[in-house]
């Protein structure tokens, strides 16, 4: 069980709180309009609670990264956030300058400020922060960003679960100077994911698809070796890799595996099949893309697949839906096919419907599958839609997440004080 400090552990009255969130949103590159404000809505409970407890809240966040078209200011984020929490959020177009510092010093209880995109500062995007030997509060605390801001605050609340697999200064550096506390979103994410990883109600089924097959296979390896998953249902590129490992000739689909740099995953799939063949389920049929039309085709080891596989087939949908229906816990990540094309959305939509209608506890990962759930109007029927993409996958793969590790360290240091 992961232990960390929460908002219940401190008195925030008249205290300055630096709140790190992940409100990285899809943005129209031409207009700058925020296309989906889900991540902004998800942090409402933490901000509202801090306001109600009399805190002075200063928010740090990022949008995209240098070189991307959606790498922009947080001005529009402040407007949307103001609407979401029903209170004006003051936007300041700098992070550590005199204007920002003066505004922070002069805050009143209940005030909320959103500072500029922290990734405008080179310290925040150094590749070194991905290396474990550099991930220490002291090292991050030595950055200019943290040294300038930390003296202004009493507490550091981290609600940026979607960035928990990162180790930038703004995510972990403040913990060298003050308690690092989990926000309500962070608390909920870690609680739910810990439950489905460490103590799921059985039978537990993992449904893994999408194009990020290496990430999904890391998750599969962890949940099978730990006895977490009773069945793993594969689809997308993940399924293709396992089909190749089983001796199927997927023709042009093998080219895609190679082009994505995933050929090495075939050997890993073979090893997993040797150990857990009875728990790994692969498609029995697929939907081929022939001149942009959906053509159902059974899989046969004696026949080469001559066209692109864009979805699982109807027999597989029925098979997977039956297994999902019997499950007490379902964890899904990645779409079953190219759901953006209407002809090949069936697998993803039907599996999501099966998950939503199941009586089991359901969790789906962020990214493409959560977007699909929104598209098909199913998201509100899922017990937990994670805000994390890479962070969720790393967590389920049993890897250390820098933000979570620092929350644990802060608990040891400050609990009971």
From Swiss-Prot:
One of its GO terms (biological process) is gluconeogenesis. Substrate binds at residues 22-24, 39, 62-65, 119, 166. It comes from the Archaea. It is an enzyme of class 2 (transferase). It catalyses: (2R)-3-phosphoglycerate + ATP = (2R)-3-phospho-glyceroyl phosphate + ADP. One of its GO terms (cellular component) is cytosol. InterPro entries: Phosphoglycerate_kinase (IPR001576), Phosphoglycerate_kinase_CS (IPR015911), Phosphoglycerate_kinase_N (IPR015824), Phosphoglycerate_kinase_sf (IPR036043). GO terms for molecular function: ADP binding; ATP binding; phosphoglycerate kinase activity. Its EC number is 2.7.2.3. Keywords: ATP-binding, Cytoplasm, Glycolysis, Kinase, Nucleotide-binding, Transferase. It is found in: Cytoplasm. The keyword Cytoplasm applies. ATP binds at residues 340, 366-369. Signal peptide: none annotated. Gene3D superfamilies: Phosphoglycerate kinase, N-terminal domain. Coiled coil: none annotated. Pathway: Carbohydrate degradation; glycolysis; pyruvate from D-glyceraldehyde 3-phosphate: step 2/5. Homodimer. Belongs to the phosphoglycerate kinase family. This is Phosphoglycerate kinase. It comes from Methanocaldococcus jannaschii (strain ATCC 43067 / DSM 2661 / JAL-1 / JCM 10045 / NBRC 100440). The gene is pgk.
């Amino acid at each position: 069980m992961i232990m960390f400090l929460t908002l219940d552990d401190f008195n925030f009255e008249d205290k300055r709180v630096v709140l790190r969130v992940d409100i990285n949103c899809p943005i129209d590159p031409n207009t700058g309009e925020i296309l989906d404000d889900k991540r902004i809505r998800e942090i409402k409970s933490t901000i509202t609670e801090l306001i109600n407890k009399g805190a002075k809240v200063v928010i740090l966040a990022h949008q995209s990264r240098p070189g991307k078209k959606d790498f922009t200011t947080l001005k529009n984020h402040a407007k949307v956030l103001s609407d979401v929490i029903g209170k004006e959020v003051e936007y300041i177009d700098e992070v550590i300058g005199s204007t920002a510092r003066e505004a922070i010093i002069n805050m009143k209880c209940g005030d909320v400020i959103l500072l500029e995109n922290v990734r405008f500062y080179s310290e925040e995007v150094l590749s070194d922060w991905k290396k474990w030997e550099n991930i220490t509060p002291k090292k991050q605390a030595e950055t200019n960003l943290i040294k300038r801001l930390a003296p202004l605050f009493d507490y550091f609340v981290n609600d940026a679960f979607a960035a928990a697999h990162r180790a930038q200064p703004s995510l972990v550096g403040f913990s060298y100077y003050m308690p690092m506390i989990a926000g309500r979103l962070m608390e909920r994410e870690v609680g739910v994911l810990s439950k489905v990883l460490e103590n799921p109600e059985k039978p537990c089924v993992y449904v893994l698809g999408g194009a990020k097959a290496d990430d999904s296979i890391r998750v599969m390896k962890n949940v099978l070796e730990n006895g977490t998953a009773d069945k793993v249902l594969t689809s997308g590129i993940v399924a293709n890799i396992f089909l190749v490992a089983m001796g199927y000739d997927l023709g042009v689909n093998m080219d895609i595996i190679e082009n994505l740099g995933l050929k090495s995953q075939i050997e890993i799939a073979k090893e997993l099949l040797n150990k857990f063949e009875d728990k790994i389920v692969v498609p029995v049929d697929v939907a081929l893309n022939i001149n942009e039309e959906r053509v159902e085709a059974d899989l046969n080891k004696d026949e080469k697949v001559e066209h692109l596989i864009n979805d699982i087939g109807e027999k597989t949908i029925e098979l997977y839906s039956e297994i999902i229906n019997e499950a007490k816990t379902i964890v899904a990540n990645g779409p079953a096919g190219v759901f953006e094309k209407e002809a090949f959305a069936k697998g993803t939509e039907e599996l999501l419907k099966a998950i939503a209608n199941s009586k089991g506890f359901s969790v789906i990962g962020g990214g493409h599958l959560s977007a699909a759930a929104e598209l098909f109007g199913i998201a509100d029927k899922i017990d937990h839609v994670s805000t994390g993409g890479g962070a969720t996958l790393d967590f389920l793969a049993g890897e250390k997440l820098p933000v979570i590790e620092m929350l644990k360290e802060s608990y040891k240091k400050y609990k009971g004080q």
